[in-house]
Amino acid sequence: MQRPIFERLIHVPGPNPVLTMGGPDDWDGAMVEAGNVLKDHHTYYFYYHGYPKNTEKWGVEGYMIGVATAMHPLGPWSRYGDKPLLGVGPEGTWDSGLIACPAVLKERENEYYLFYSGNFPCHIGLARATNPLGPWTKYEKNPILEDFGYLGGVVKVGGKYYMYSEYPIDLNSPDQGPFCLATADHPEGPWERYEGNPILAVEGWGTWDDGGYSEAGMLYHEGMFHTFYGGTKWTKFESIGYAYSSDGKTFHKHPQNPVVMRERCPGISGFAEVHALFEPPLFYVYATQRYIVSLDEKESSFGREHLATHVLATSVPFRFDMPVMTLDSLAAEAVTELEACPPIGLENINSFALTAECSYDASAKAGLRVKVFPSYDGLSYDTEPTACFDNAFESGKCCRKTVAVDPMVKFAKVVLENLDGSKAIGDVKVVATLGSV
C-alpha cells in the first residue's frame, strides 16, 4: 500500500448547515444536495442540485442545477438568482426528467465546462459557459457518455480528462455503489471506460463503508489524486472517508478512515455527495447533510437534506476563520435565539477567538453584546454563558473587537444582544478564529 501523503487529518466541523432548501415555491424548495465547489479568482461557487416542492409551478418532478456564491470557503453562501442555473431538457429528450450531480471545470479564462448526470440510467451531459454563473449552453451532441451513473467529478491532468462516477447505482445498497473511471482527450469525448473498473470498490462486510459510496468529487494536487467520499452502512449512516492515488486509477483508503465521523456531528445521520477544495494546509470538504429523524417525522422527512462544510487540517499548527453569524440588522433591544447560531466545534481546537463587527447609527446610545454558551454534546447548551463581551462602540461608526475564549468544551454557540433601546445595529458579523498549536 502506498504511504499516505498526509499522515493525519484533523477534523473541525463548519458552520452547518451552510445552505438549506429554498421556500415552498422556490425551484429548490423540497431538497438540496451537494455538487462540486469551484474557486475562481476571489469567489467560491458551490454548485448543487435541488428539487422543487411546488412541482406544478416549475413543471418538473426532478432535480435541477443551481449555484451559491461566497467570498470565503466556509460562507456565508448566497443563492444566485431565483431560477435554476441549468434546467431539464424538453419533453422526450434524454435529460427531460432530471439533471443532477454538477461538476464544473475551468478550462481556461472565460471557458468553463459543466458535466452532469441526466435521467435514469443516468447518462452524462455537458454544458459550456464563459462565466461560472452562466448562461450555460448544453452541448448539441449530448449525452457524451451513456449509462455511467451519478457523476462525481472531472479533473484534467497532463492534457487528459478523468471522469469519476458512482456506477452501477444500487450495487451495494440503495442509491450507493462503487466508483468508476472514464477518460478522454477532449471534454466532448469520445470517453473510454477504464478496463480496470471499479477503481474503488467495497472491501467487505463489516467495514465502516460496506454499504458502498455516494458520488464524490476528485482533486488533483502536486502529482496526487484525492477524493473524499460518503461511505455508508445499510442503515444509511454515512461518514466521510478519504482515498488517494498517484495515477488516478489505483486508490488507497486512508488508515485513519473515516476522517469525518457522523457520530461526532450531533443530530446528523450522514454525509453524502462529498466534494472538496484544498488550500494548504486545509481541505475544505462539502457534502449533503442528512438528519436523524424520529418515527413520527419520517413522513415529512423528504427534503431534510441541507448542505454542509467541514475543515480537515493536514498539519499542526493551523488556524482559520469561520463565519458564525451574519445579520443585515439587529433591531433595538433584540436578542437572537440560540438556534440561530450554528454549533462551533471545538473538540480538536486549543485556540479560540471571536471577532464581532457591526455598524452603529449616528444617534445610537449603546452597542452589541456577545454571549457564548457551551455544550458538551452539541445538543443541550448551558443556560448561562461561559463568556460575555461587548463590542467596541462609537456612534455612527463601524466597530469591531476580538476576544479570546477558552475552548474548554466540545461545542459553543453565540447569542447577540442589541443594548440600544431605540436604534437598530447594522451589518452584524461574528467570526470565530479556530486553531491548534
Model-derived features with residue positions:
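Carbohydrate-active catalytic/glycan-binding domains of CAZyme proteins
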Residues: M1-M322, T336, N348, E394-P407, ...
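Extended, low-complexity, turn-rich repeat/linker tracts enriched in Gly/Pro/Ser/Thr and Asp/Glu
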Residues: N54, W234-T235, C358-G367, D420-A424
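C-terminal interaction-tip segments
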Residues: D321-A332, N418-V437
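Surface-exposed ligand/attachment interfaces on beta-rich extracellular proteins
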Residues: L327-L346, Y360-K365, G396-C398
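Aromatic, loop-rich ligand-recognition surfaces of beta-strand-rich domains
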Residues: P342-K365, K429-G435
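Noncatalytic modules at the cell exterior or secretory-pathway interfaces
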Residues: S351-L354, V405-D427
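Short, surface-exposed beta-strand/strand-loop-strand elements in extracellular ectodomains
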Residues: K365-G378
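Solvent-exposed serine/threonine-rich low-complexity stretches and specific carbohydrate-binding patches
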Residues: T383-F393
